[in-house]
From Swiss-Prot:
PANTHER family: SODIUM-DEPENDENT NUTRIENT AMINO ACID TRANSPORTER 1-RELATED, SODIUM/CHLORIDE DEPENDENT TRANSPORTER. Keywords: Amino-acid transport, Glycoprotein, Ion transport, Membrane, Sodium, Sodium transport, Symport, Transmembrane, Transmembrane helix, Transport. It comes from Drosophila erecta (Fruit fly). This is Sodium-dependent nutrient amino acid transporter 1. The gene is NAAT1. Residues 1-36 are annotated as: Disordered. Belongs to the sodium:neurotransmitter symporter (SNF) (TC 2.A.22) family. It is a multi-pass membrane protein. InterPro entries: Na/ntran_symport (IPR000175), SNS_sf (IPR037272). It comes from the Eukaryota. Glycans are attached at residues 183, 188. The chain crosses the membrane at residues 39-59, 72-92, 109-129, 229-249, 258-278, 307-327, 341-361, 401-421, 441-461, 474-494, 516-536, 552-572. Residues 25-35 have a biased composition (Basic and acidic residues).
């Protein structure tokens, strides 16, 4: 199609070297438009993408998700999902951000009727930010107390009945004397151990009781409220947000420099922990337990759903950071290479993190003389704040050092992720209101993030975290990612999109990308989303079901996020009438005059390129012997010949 939003001058179009005065004046005015800040260099962008995509999801979430969904066999659906959904979505978001030099909302000048996708993703991002910062607060708390002469979770308090010390000798002595730890069926954070006989009293480790009674002061019923914020965790939450603000206050100028540390330091610690872990007794059993495939799970649709959820969570697609980071690139930056590096590194890091974690859990099972490693594995926060601290307390040499390294690594990983999420929100606001100072918006949004995070440092905070993550994070992000892909590929058109990529990257789009974007990726995502909705069950925390009011609040949260798409679409149609409502709706499905490269000179070159492509296809259509069906099929698959 011929572009009419911005036309080349007569001189440019005719090739005679002349331009009219009106075109010159317009060009000069456009040249005075402030340009977007760019990364200091391409490596800053790559490091920033690594810092957000290689985060807590790799070291924390992936090991347990893989273990619960087939062990080593989970890698097969995960890698398939990575190549058919993860990589295509990641590359697409990089392209959209770099091509337009705009954030998550402004990119929808490509299909203005889909602007609600950007606002909905912003809502989902805010939900994730709200609870993510509370995890940083917990991590900071454990980091601070790790400097004590004795790890505070390694021994029991007098008021804790049925408690077993996490310190190694006492633990083993208790086990050998016939007192064992039982897996508490009523709790997600179960006690470690086995039952010697039916009358054996159920015991809990000191690391578990420390987390539940000292750190979060957990409530097992939130029907009467969540309680008041804990002052220690509140201070840790405040410290986390101060660090976040300092990193993002100058935009990519400051976050780009911090990205080197945020991306590389965790690998240093992870390799140190890996070397230590694989040398521990029982490590081999833990690693084999993690990698041992359960082939029957491959036929379970839930496993494939979890692979998609893990892929989205790990790569941070569908929530805006990748688009935002890419928008600060130079227009000709080689993003294809970066997309391949980050997505591959993300998978390798997940595997590395899983081996490290399960090697240490294997050592924990060995020390406790427990044959089934399943009894020492926990999900969610229990893995990071119960199982791992419990294992560290049994290290014979300087357990404090390894505790500090582990929790500092978690904190850095978390900061890398939340910096990207928070910067996404700040960029959306600054794109919308050009006159606002970036640091002021960063300060205000950081203060709001701190206030929202207070609910998660209450005794009922883990309940709220589970609720918001399930309804406001996972499902909102997933459904809007489907609309995101559909808007670009099916409404704007894959052929147009491939032309834009060819112009920007100076390379043809391969069949792999075209087939993924046009068919495999959207179809798989739609099928998995429908399956998730059909098989959805009431959520639980610590094996306890949420109150009915909490479930209603969760569905309301999901509805608010998902409703952003149609509501903002209707708003755009009402604000841009084209006669009848049907004509206005059709107009909202076409690119606005703002769509295209931000730089005026690049934009004019792009218009010429697109019009040349349109004329070329019109000529080919006249002489082509292909039937109507085959022409439509090649257009659908984005053939840019």
């Amino acid at each position: 199609m011929e572009l009419k939003g911005v036309q080349p001058s007569n001189g440019s179009a005719n090739g005679n070297g002349t331009t009219n005065a009106a075109s010159t004046e317009k060009t000069d005015a456009e040249k005075h438009t402030p340009e977007r800040t760019n990364w200091g260099n391409g490596l800053e962008f790559l490091m920033s993408c690594i810092s957000v995509s290689v985060g807590l999801g790799n070291v924390w979430r992936f090991p347990f998700t893989a273990y619960e969904n087939g062990g080593g066999a989970f890698l097969i659906p995960y890698i398939i999902v990575l190549f058919l959904i993860g990589k295509p979505m990641y590359y697409l978001e990089m392209i959209m951000g770099q091509f337009t030099s705009q954030g998550t909302v402004k990119i929808w000048s490509v299909v203005p009727g889909f602007v609600g996708v950007g606002y909905g993703q912003a809502f989902g991002t805010i939900c994730i930010i709200s609870y993510y910062s509370s995890l940083l607060a917990l991590t900071l708390y454990y980091l601070f107390v790790s400097f004590q002469s004795e790890l505070p979770w390694s021994y029991c308090r007098d008021e804790w009945t049925n408690c077993v010390n996490s310190r190694p000798q006492e633990y083993v002595d208790n086990l050998l004397s016939g007192v064992s730890l039982a897996n508490e069926s009523a709790r997600n954070f179960s006690a470690i151990g086995s039952v010697a006989n039916e009358e054996t009293e159920k015991l809990q480790s000191s690391s578990e009781l420390y987390f539940l009674n000292v750190v979060i002061k957990e409530k097992l019923d939130i029907s009467d409220g969540v309680g008041d914020p804990d002052w220690k965790l509140t201070l840790a939450l405040l410290a986390a947000w101060v660090v976040i603000f300092l990193v993002i206050m100058r935009g990519v100028k400051s976050s780009g420099k911090a990205a080197y540390f945020l991306a590389l330091f965790p690998y240093v610690v992870l390799f140190v922990l890996l070397i230590r872990a694989v040398t521990l007794e029982g490590a081999r059993d833990g690693i084999l337990f993690f990698l041992e495939p359960q082939w029957g799970e491959l036929l379970n649709p839930t496993v494939w759903k979890e692979a998609v959820v893990q892929c989205f969570f790990s790569l941070a697609v569908g929530s805006g950071p990748i688009i935002m980071f890419a928008s600060y690139n130079r227009f000709d930056h080689g993003i294809y290479r970066d997309a391949m590096i980050v997505t591959t590194l993300d998978t390798l890091t997940s595997l590395l993190g899983g081996i490290t974690i399960f090697a240490i859990l294997g050592n924990l099972a060995h020390n406790l003389q427990i044959e089934n490693i399943r009894d020492v594995v926990r999900s969610g926060t229990g893995l990071a704040f119960i199982s791992y601290p419990d294992a560290i307390s049994k290290f014979k040499a300087v357990p404090q050092l390894f505790s500090v390294l582990f929790f500092f690594m978690l904190f850095v990983l978390g900061i890398g992720s939340i910096v990207a999420l928070q910067s996404t929100i700040v960029t959306i606001i600054c794109d919308q209101f050009k006159g606002l100072k970036y640091w002021k918006v960063a300060l205000i949004t950081s203060a709001c993030g701190f206030l929202m995070g207070l609910v998660y440092v209450t005794p009922g905070g883990q309940w709220i975290l589970t609720l918001v993550d399930f309804y406001g994070g996972t499902y909102v992000v997933f459904i809007l990612a489907i609309f995101e892909l559909a808007g670009i590929v099916w409404v704007y058109g894959l052929q147009n999109f491939c032309d834009d990529i060819e112009f920007m990257c100076n390379r043809r789009v391969s069949l792999y990308w075209r087939m993924c974007w046009s068919f495999f990726t959207p179809v798989m995502m739609i099928i998995i989303f429908i399956y998730s909705m059909v098989t959805i069950e009431p959520i639980k925390y610590s094996e306890l079901y949420f109150p009915e009011a909490a479930n209603i609040a969760g569905w309301l949260l999901f509805a608010i996020g998902a409703a952003q798409f149609p509501l903002w679409g209707l708003w755009y149609v009402s604000r841009h009438p084209q006669g009848t409502y049907w004509k206005s709706l059709k107009a909202s499905m076409k690119p606005s005059e703002r769509w295209g490269p931000a730089n005026p000179e690049t934009r004019r070159e792009w218009v010429i390129f697109k019009n040349h492509k349109a004329a070329q296809r019109a000529t080919q259509k006249d002489v082509s012997k292909l039937g109507f069906f085959w022409r439509k099929l090649t257009n659908f698959c984005g053939s840019n010949k």
